[in-house]
């Protein structure tokens, strides 16, 4: 049992070090986009492929926006008579 414990400790403490064999592994050669990969909900609802994944969220947001727009159009009074 103690041997298994030592193997687990050894396996979790191994620190990877950079290798000079593969030049594609260093950061200079693998430049990626600086843009964040995550989309905001508004961006996702605007993209058809992403919209399908969170359709209920997009529809709820559209319904809320429509209700809010309708509420803003209602006449209101500041004083009660």
From Swiss-Prot:
Its main location: secreted. Residues 17-35, 78-81 form a propeptide. GO terms for cellular component: extracellular region; host cell postsynaptic membrane. Expressed by the venom duct. Disulfide bonds join 44-50, 45-58. Residues 19-30 have a biased composition (Basic and acidic residues). Residues 46-48 are annotated as: Lacks the Ser-Xaa-Pro motif that is crucial for potent interaction with nAChR. It is found in: Secreted. One of its GO terms (molecular function) is ion channel regulator activity. Residues 1-16 form the signal peptide. Keywords: Acetylcholine receptor inhibiting toxin, Disulfide bond, Ion channel impairing toxin, Neurotoxin, Postsynaptic neurotoxin, Secreted, Signal, Toxin. InterPro entries: Conotoxin_a-typ. Belongs to the conotoxin A superfamily. The cysteine framework is I (CC-C-C). Alpha4/7 pattern. Alpha-conotoxins act on postsynaptic membranes, they bind to the nicotinic acetylcholine receptors (nAChR) and thus inhibit them. Has possibly a distinct nAChR binding mode from other alpha-conotoxins, due to a different three residue motif (lacks the Ser-Xaa-Pro motif). This is Alpha-conotoxin-like Pu1.5. It comes from Conus pulicarius.
């Amino acid at each position: 049992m103690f041997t298994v414990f030592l193997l687990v400790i050894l396996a979790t403490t191994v620190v990877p070090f950079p290798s000079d064999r593969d030049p594609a592994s260093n950061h200079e050669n693998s430049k990626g986009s600086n843009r964040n990969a995550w989309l905001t909900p508004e961006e996702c609802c605007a993209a058809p492929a992403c919209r399908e994944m969170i359709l209920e969220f997009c529809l709820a947001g559209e319904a809320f926006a429509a209700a809010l727009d309708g509420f803003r159009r209602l006449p209101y009074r500041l004083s009660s008579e």
